[in-house]
Amino acid sequence: MEEEFKDKGLPPTLLHLIPDGREWKVKEADGEGSRNTNLDADEDKELELKLGLPGVQQEERAADSREKIQQQQRESSSEPSIGCFPTHSKPTTSIGTTGAKRGFFAIVGATLEGYNQSHRDTEECGKELTLGDENMAGERKKGCCPSPPCSAAAHSSNPQGRGAIPPVVGWPPIRSFRRNLTNGSSFKQSPERQNDEADDKAKPICKKRPLVKINMDGIPIGRKVDLQIYDSYQKLSSAVEELFRGFLEAQKDLSCAESGEQGAEDKIFSGLLDGTGVYTLVYEDNDGDRMLAGDIPWKVFVSTVKRLRVMRRSELPHDMIGADPVK
């Protein structure tokens, strides 16, 4: 064939170098069948039901598309180049060459189109990622980084759909009545109650005992006296005389009764407060100290007295005798 073109003086073209178009027709038929099968497989995969997150299916589709593109590139690279075609002595017809040309350009065009589309998709994804990173960096510099809309919607829907979360009580758990007691003690008091407490504090502290024990030397039986009904030492002295006069009359000496002495009881109780009589009134305070009755004001005496005793003057210490009573 080359000799014929040399005789005519014309250079050979690409289509005249292809000896036979049967192989290209077979490849074209195979390519169309493979495309049809691939499309059917893609449709089956799209209609297939799978369990997973929403973004997983998109990732799988992208991976499948990348695998298809790589497979097509490998097939195109494995095909023989134009310069390696074998030469045959048989002449070729124009019909075979046109069919081979169409099949070859269809395969190459589809491969290039798929590769360009995947390249554009990857570039767009890269641009979106870079823009998103730049926006996040700018927001962090400004000091405000809002959460994504999906998370915000989830947070906003949670309090509406669910009830209020109970407060943590710690471990071990506290019983309900103990928790109520602690909460009740922490509440502030009402203003009226606070005013009443302030008034009570302003008043002088006066510990008033309803009844105080009183004993007398020589009489084994004690008595009790209410200090609230008296307002002075003189009234208290007369009350003590009335309490123990009957006991003294029962225990008086027979010699005094035979001699007919009268008014002995009056002499006994005449000097209870000043210490000039046979007996003297002594009290014991909160600290346990013994003191003569009448040395402090009456109100203070009532608030501090713990016990009363009528003692003989001969048994008193010399420091206590001769104190001036307070009336």
UniProtKB/Swiss-Prot annotation:
SUPFAM superfamilies referenced in this protein's UniProt entry, alphabetically: CAD & PB1 domains
Comp. bias intervals (Low complexity): 70-82
Name assigned to this protein: Auxin-responsive protein IAA18
Subcellular location: Nucleus
GO biological process: auxin-activated signaling pathway; regulation of DNA-templated transcription; response to auxin
Subunit architecture: Homodimers and heterodimers.
Tissue: Highly expressed in flowers. Expressed in roots and etiolated seedlings.
UniProt induction comment: Not induced by auxin.
Organism: Oryza sativa subsp. japonica
Gene that this sequence comes from: IAA18
UniProt biased composition (Polar residues): 180-189
PB1 domain span: 209-313
Principal cellular location given in the protein's record: nucleus
Task performed by this protein: Aux/IAA proteins are short-lived transcriptional factors that function as repressors of early auxin response genes at low auxin concentrations.
UniProt keyword annotations, A-Z: Auxin signaling pathway, Nucleus, Repressor, Transcription, Transcription regulation
Ranges spanned by the short sequence motif EAR-like (transcriptional repression), renumbered to the chain: 49-53
Family assignment from sequence similarity: Belongs to the Aux/IAA family.
GO terms for cellular component: nucleus
Region listing for Disordered, in residue ranges: 26-45, 52-98, 180-202
Amino acid composition bias (Basic and acidic residues), ranges on this chain: 58-69, 190-202
